[in-house]
């Protein structure tokens, strides 16, 4: 996409819970469908706040996947990607997800609480995201309602 848009980007792969960036390096941090997969999601929020500049914006697009049974695919469209994976793989995904602490939290309420502990303010939640993103039940349809969180790091002033 960067090449297509003729934009220079420095893509890096690293642990979201232990970033190698300097403190206050970024104006914006964006995450999509990541937080729910992290063994220590609270640590990730701490790191994301650390690398944000004062007044910087955190945008997190995620869902309360812990409340969803991945092994249950009967409600998905026939051509849905999860139906191509097979029952044993979907059950394995379910088993792994159940081991993650975040899967037992009520989200996004938990996220708001964690962000407040990490110098984040002006926290807003958009619970209507899925209705705008998933207009039809195609192979990419996600029955778990997504949410968007926007929060600003407290200014130094």
Specify the residue positions occupied by each region the protein language model found.
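Short glycine/proline- and acidic residue-enriched helix-loop micro-motifs
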Residues: 90-102
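Short alpha-helix
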Residues: 101-126
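A short glycine-rich, Lys/Arg-flanked "PGG" loop and its adjoining helix->strand segment in the class I
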Residues: 42-57
């Amino acid at each position: 996409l960067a090449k297509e848009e003729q934009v220079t980007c420095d893509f890096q792969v690293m642990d979201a819970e232990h970033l190698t960036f300097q403190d206050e390096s970024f104006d914006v941090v964006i995450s999509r469908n990541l937080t729910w997969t992290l063994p220590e999601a609270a640590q990730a929020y701490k790191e994301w706040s650390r690398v944000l500049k004062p007044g910087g914006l955190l945008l997190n697009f995620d869902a309360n996947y812990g409340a969803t049974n991945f092994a249950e695919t009967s409600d998905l469209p026939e051509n849905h990607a999860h139906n191509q994976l097979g029952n044993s793989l979907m059950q394995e995904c379910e088993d792994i997800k159940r081991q993650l602490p975040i899967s037992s939290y009520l989200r996004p309420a938990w996220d708001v609480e964690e962000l407040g502990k990490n110098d984040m303010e002006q926290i807003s939640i958009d619970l209507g995201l899925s209705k705008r993103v998933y207009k039809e039940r195609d192979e990419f349809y996600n029955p778990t309602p997504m949410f968007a969180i926007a929060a600003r790091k407290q200014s130094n002033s």
